[in-house]
Amino acid sequence: MKDVLERFLGYIKVDTQSSEESDTVPTTKTQLEFAKKLGEELKAIGLKDVSVDENGYVMATLESNIDKKVPTIGFIAHMDTSPDLSGTNINPRIVEKYDGQDIVLNKEKNIVLKINEFPEILEYKGQDIVVTDGNTLLGADDKAGIAEIITAMEYLINHPEIKHGTIKVGFTPDEEVGKGADHFDVKKFGADLAYTLDGGGIGELECETFNAAKAKVIIEGRNVHPGSAKNKMTNAVLVANKFINMLPENEVPERTEGYEGFFHLLSVKSEVETAELNYIIRDFDRKKFEERKEQIKEVGKKINEEYNKEIVCVKVEDQYYNMKEKIDEVKYVVDIAHDAMKAIDIEPILVPIRGGTDGSRLSFMGLPTPNLFAGGHNFHGRFEFVPVLSMEKAAELVVKIAELYANR
């Protein structure tokens, strides 16, 4: 029987970055290849009804070993890693019995995981921690989740004395580019409720996400020779700058926390003739979320009024909503996860997700899906790390949740 660390180290060797630019499903071929490998592994450990569809979704079943009817639960993780940093040739290192000091990730490039910048690592002093070599991300988001789920399923198969109902396993592509639930067949999956293992540090239990939208701002300028441009030229670069400055300067990711929302400018492409701004809009409160969408549209209207012509076009598109609306209808799914953590000596930390998970969309598709910790920290970057014990406890948590549903 493989342990969770062995699985994790094997999975991160496979580059499964998703792509913002691709229109294929999944967005990268390597995700489909990885999905097929996972499907074979699920069959090998003894799961039933294993399927890998053409879109890269993996599903499988662990059959009930009890007579009474209990809810069918699902455990879900995503296969892709973030496009934000390379996932090619990940070269992990295990820092044994971490001593509480700065960790040199790459001596040659002077890349150091410093405790004054990432103080949360001190919580794991004395533990074994998996880190990067400073050149890539680690992939704990979310291959730690995959390793934990499969390890838990194998444990349940090898320990039939632990009673459980029917359990569904699902692995999705393209979560990191917001498409993880696009082709997820909730009916085929067949669960009454589910949990994603896509959270951060040990103990995190999340049932709230942002409401999310994206906005594309197109600015049409007019280029005229600068020598004769007076009262003729409209410089789209300067209009773009005006637009940016008309949104609240403190309502940005780097100046907000907790339940505070924001406007996040992702990219700017501009020249005199035309400019394009790409934003994401986030807020936990549905009313404030709607107000933010109107606010960014209003900026465009004001600029058009100032120039007395339609030079700014703002297109806003919703992405996902705060899953709390749906989780609150079946609050016991959170209560059971809370009790399961307590039962294995983990202190639950109820926190809002300042982001989204597949569970955000799935909850609105009829599958209530709160999020559990996978154990990692500093996702999407070279300072990503995951304590080995956190992964082991996440696998143990999956087992305990299954057990509590059987005894419910």
Swiss-Prot record:
EC number assigned by the record: 3.4.11.4
Species the sequence originates in: Clostridium botulinum (strain Kyoto / Type A2)
Active site as annotated: D80, E175
Role description: Cleaves the N-terminal amino acid of tripeptides.
Protein name: Peptidase T
Cofactor: Zn(2+)
Domain of life: Bacteria
Any one Gene Ontology cellular component term annotated for this protein: cytosol
